[in-house]
Structures are given as structure tokens and as C-alpha cells.
Amino acid sequence: MPRRVAPFDYQHAVKQGHQLPVLRYLNVDRFVHRPLGALVVRAVYPTRISPNQITYASFVVGVVAAACFCLPVRGWVVAGACLQLLSNVLDSADGMLARAKGLGSRFGATLDLMLDRIGDLLLYGSTIVAYYNATGDARLAIAGLVGLSAFNLQVTLYYLVEQYRKAERTGMSGETRALASWAIVVCALAGRFDLLMWLMILEPIGNIVYRLWYFHHLPADPA
């Protein structure tokens, strides 16, 4: 007889995020990505598809989305925005499937983290190319590159602070990453990559200042 699969439990599969004040009102991960991701999980739950396979699929779709943003045609930019939304949904579904089936592993969590960071770098870099293609403004595009460098520094500081705290979590919350990705999707659909450039410049700088302030106020010798 075929092995009976327990029904999919959505509440058990959803990861509890870190509720920053802004996420109470702009939690696109909770209200958009997770419900759509749950549909994906329900479809693949009875199959042999693994969480890691969904992680790879999310990454590949994200890479294609970034490539679309680099093309100087409006239709491809819109397609890139739609593909990025799909990548976000799949990125929500992989962890949900792992928790639902009890297949969570250190390798899977690390794989997801590594591919997320690579995907973020490609996505943010492609938006700079998209802005330059749309406007020809090299000055703000160069400023966007500075913002991208600041983003990488922001991520490095995040992991250093979390390592110092000996925190068990391995990456930024899904809600935070989803909000940043959603801003890219909205700006791409609206054709406002200029706003996105300013966000890429100002947000990492503000986050770096916050991380340094936060680290300064941590206990000198955490348990």
C-alpha cells in the first residue's frame, strides 16, 4: 500500500517572524507570499519534491528575473517584476515545506541563506542597470553602486552582530527581505527606478548606523 501522507498543516509550517513596527502594516510576506507559497506547498506536499529543490527553483527564477531587468525593453522589465514575485513565493514555500514535513536541516537552511544573498546581489545590481537603461543618468547609477556596496556592508555587519550575540537565527527575517523585494517589484512595474536608487542609497546607510548603535549597546560579555 502507498505510504499515507499526513495533511498539510499551514500554521505549523509558517515560520514566526520578527515583528518590526513597520512590518505590522506592510507585512507583504505574511499577506502575499505565505498564502501563495502555501498553495505551492499544498500542490507538491504529496510528491517527492524536496524543499531544497524548491530553493534551487526560487534561485533560478530570481536569476532570470535579474536578467530581464537588464534588458532595455519595458516588457522585459515587467516580466522581471512578475518573475521576482514568483521567486519570492517559492522562497517562502521551501521553508514552509521543510517545516511541514519535518525535513528541516542545517544544510538546507545554509543553502537557502547562501542562494538568497547571491540572488539579492544579482537583483539589486540588475536594478541599477535597469535605471541606467531607462534614464541614461550615470551619476545616480554610480550612486546606486555605492548603495549596493553599502548593502553588502550592512549584511556583513548584521551577521557579525548576530554572531557576537550568539543568536540562533541564520538570516534576516523573511518579512524584511520580502518588503525590500516588494519595493523593487512595485518600482519596476511603475517604471520608477529613480525612487529605487534613492532607497538603495539611503536604506543601507541608515541600517549601518543602526547596526553600529545596536552593537554599541550590547552587553560586553553575552552569555
Please provide the spans of the model-predicted regions.
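The feature identifies polytopic integral membrane transport proteins across all domains of life
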Residues: 81, 106-110, 167-171
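Hydrophobic residues within alpha-helical transmembrane segments
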Residues: 60, 82, 86, 111-115, ...
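Membrane-embedded alpha-helical segments that form the functional core of polytopic membrane enzymes
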Residues: 51-107
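A generic hydrophobic-helix recognition signal that picks specific residues
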Residues: 43, 84-87, 105, 109, ...
